[in-house]
Amino acid sequence: MQFGVSTHLYHGARLDRDHLVEIAAHGFEAVEIYATRTHFDYHDEQAVIGVEGHLKDARLRAHAVHAPTTESYRDGVWGPSYSIAHGDESARKQAVEETAAAIRAAYRLGAPLVVLHPGTPTAQQPSAKDNRTDAFVRSVEELHAVAEPLGVRLALEVIPNRLGDAQSLVDLLEGALDLERLGLCLDTGHSNILGDVSEAVEIAGGYVIATHLHDNDGRADSHQVPFTGAIDWPTVLMAFRKIGYEGTWVFELVGTEPRLVLERAARARRRIEELLTS
């Protein structure tokens, strides 16, 4: 049983060796790298080589790369967003090109997965042209053609919008997106906003190939450490046991004091391990 941390925790800074060493120092074995160019410039070969070296120094495994969702993130301010489900063809193509670059970076880092957002969360007030099913299907097909020859799998993330609930994504995987090497990233916090987390886990079932573990109050996407919000973790983890999930467990957290967040995540890990093995 392996656990990792998303570099989303350090999203506002340029990803460096110290961040990865800090994650490893708290007992984590893996990392998911958040691909925003102001954080990790997946277009820059030297930046990719640098992170590759930092991972080796920290003895961390690159579990996944999170596809870009924004052009930049500085001082708490988000830049223009990317959506592979955008109905405007130029916007869709730009998002696909950025994601394709992140897939190639994942391959270079040895990360077997790239996590994709099916459009833009409703809370971010997407334009009327965004979150189109036909655009999303076309984009995933194009990205699958990039990822499949590299041996990289695409994980469609459960997010709070009309495309991103577990049932809608399963319907796509069993219909318009019946492609090899596709799966789901079960995000517990997003599932909690959408409804019942354990139900989402069971609906996703064997399609789950990645996780984002975080908690909230059921309304705001606050990315809290598990066991600090409203999620019923014993029931949720029982659902994961029921579907036979054996992949990496990734914490996707935020906080102004990363070291403190990691300490709390390490304690949450121990509780999760106890619940999964009891």
Label every PLM stretch briefly.
Residues 1-101, 107, 148, 195, ...:
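N-terminal pre-domain/capping segments
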Residues 2, 30-31, 37, 131, ...:
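Acidic/histidine-rich catalytic cores of soluble enzymes
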Residues 6-10, 34-36, 67-70, 119-121, ...:
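Active-site beta-loop-alpha junctions enriched in small/polar residues
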Residues 17, 57, 74-183:
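Active-site acidic/histidine proton-transfer and metal-coordination neighborhood
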Residues 20-21, 48-52, 99-103, 137-144, ...:
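Generic structural signal for well-ordered alpha-helices
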Residues 23, 31, 55, 95, ...:
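Conserved, mostly hydrophobic/aromatic
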Residues 28, 106, 111, 208, ...:
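A structural motif
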Residues 73, 85, 122-127, 193-194, ...:
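A short acidic, helix-capping loop that chelates divalent metal ions and anchors anionic groups
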